[in-house]
């Protein structure tokens, strides 16, 4: 069996195989079967690629849902909308503002579990983030390290229990929106306190499921956390070994805004690093501006390919999403986000006899 794997973004474990019966052809010929005495006639089936939208898990568009302790679970309407749109992901932003100086209460933890149960019952997975503030004008952006560490320990069992419906975890916790920029306790850009930040990310890597990656906001955050240079992207031999380097991925929440995506990148070196590193990590995020020259269809598709994008938040920025729909680019992006497995051909023994081994 011969297959090709078309990767537009990052990685996922499972896939649905898509074949087009319309282009199916059968060829016959004599192929040497090394497991039997004589050459055996083999048949070969060649398939054409199905270019339709495939609802593969852990990839594609997602919508953002914010929850606090008094929230109800994701509604049946939202679930049905996801399914009818062939979306397999939802973004859960668990808001911890009311626990910024105290442990997470049982109501909040119970609400999280009910949401994960609802996803499991409907074959959907979540991108998960935990935040303390949802505005750059918030009086306090994040909790003190001792509180965050307590929260991480509280979250450990629930995330482990539900790792089957969690696609990835965004680093969160620090800064406005959990994006590690405007921060109360961990330093701001240019004065970031990486000793404290490493304490938090190391606790997350230790406590959260080893099978899941944690996405950070910029490439320099990853390299600074790991004390490595931009000349050290993941290699094939390092990929998926569950080391901290292999488990840290990327989320860009100002995608296609301008040349540097509003500070996501500082220059060409960290762009190149991310293009190489992202071959083996999860990558996703959201847009943050109205349409730009960088978001025009061909440019957007090319950039998503270079950075191996897996998922994109549909909730923001609405003007850019609308522009993709108006220019007939939306469906193409939806199809290409993530991965596709395509069966190209199958060879099999045309006739078999009892007692012999065949391919």
Language model features: what each stretch is:
Residues 31-89, 93-95:
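Boundary/entry segment of secreted carbohydrate-active catalytic domains
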Residues 75-133, 145-148, 208, 212:
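Aromatic-lined substrate-binding rim segments of carbohydrate-active enzymes
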Residues 108-125, 142-168, 193-207:
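An active-site-proximal structural segment forming one wall of the substrate-binding cleft
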Residues 296-351:
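Catalytic cores of secreted or luminal carbohydrate-active enzymes
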Residues 356-358:
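Structural beta-strand segments of beta-rich domains
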């Amino acid at each position: 069996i011969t297959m090709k794997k078309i990767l537009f973004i990052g990685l996922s474990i499972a896939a649905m195989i898509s074949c087009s019966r319309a282009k199916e052809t059968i060829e016959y010929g004599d192929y040497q079967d090394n497991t039997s005495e004589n050459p055996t006639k083999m048949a070969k089936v060649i398939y054409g690629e199905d270019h339709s939208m495939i609802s593969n898990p852990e990839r594609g568009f997602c919508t953002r849902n914010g929850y606090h302790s008094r929230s109800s679970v994701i509604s049946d309407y939202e679930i049905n909308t996801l399914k009818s749109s062939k979306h397999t992901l939802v973004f859960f932003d668990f808001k911890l503002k009311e626990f910024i100086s105290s442990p997470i209460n049982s109501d909040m933890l119970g609400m999280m579990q009910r949401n994960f149960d609802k996803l499991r019952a409907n074959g959907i997975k979540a991108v998960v983030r935990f935040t303390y503030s949802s505005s750059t004008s918030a009086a306090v952006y994040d909790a003190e390290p001792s509180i965050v560490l307590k929260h991480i320990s509280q979250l450990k069992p629930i995330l482990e229990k539900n790792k089957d419906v969690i696609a990835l975890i965004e680093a969160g916790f620090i800064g406005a929106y959990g994006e590690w920029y405007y921060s109360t306790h961990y330093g701001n850009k240019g004065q970031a306190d990486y000793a404290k930040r490493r304490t938090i990310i190391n606790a997350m890597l230790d406590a959260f499921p080893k099978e899941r990656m944690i996405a950070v906001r910029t490439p320099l955050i990853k390299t600074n956390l790991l004390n490595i240079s931009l000349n050290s992207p993941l290699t094939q031999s390092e990929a998926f070994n569950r080391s901290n380097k292999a488990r840290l991925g990327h989320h860009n929440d100002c995608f296609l805004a301008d040349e540097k995506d509003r500070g996501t990148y500082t220059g060409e070196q960290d762009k190149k690093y991310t293009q190489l590193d992202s071959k083996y990590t999860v990558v996703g995020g959201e847009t943050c501006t109205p349409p730009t020259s960088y978001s025009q269809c061909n440019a957007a598709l090319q950039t998503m390919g270079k950075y191996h994008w897996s998922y994109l938040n549909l909730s923001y920025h609405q003007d850019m999403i609308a522009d993709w729909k108006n220019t007939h680019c939306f469906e193409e992006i939806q199809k290409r986000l993530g991965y596709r497995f395509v069966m190209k051909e199958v060879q099999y023994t045309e006739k078999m006899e009892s007692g012999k081994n065949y391919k």
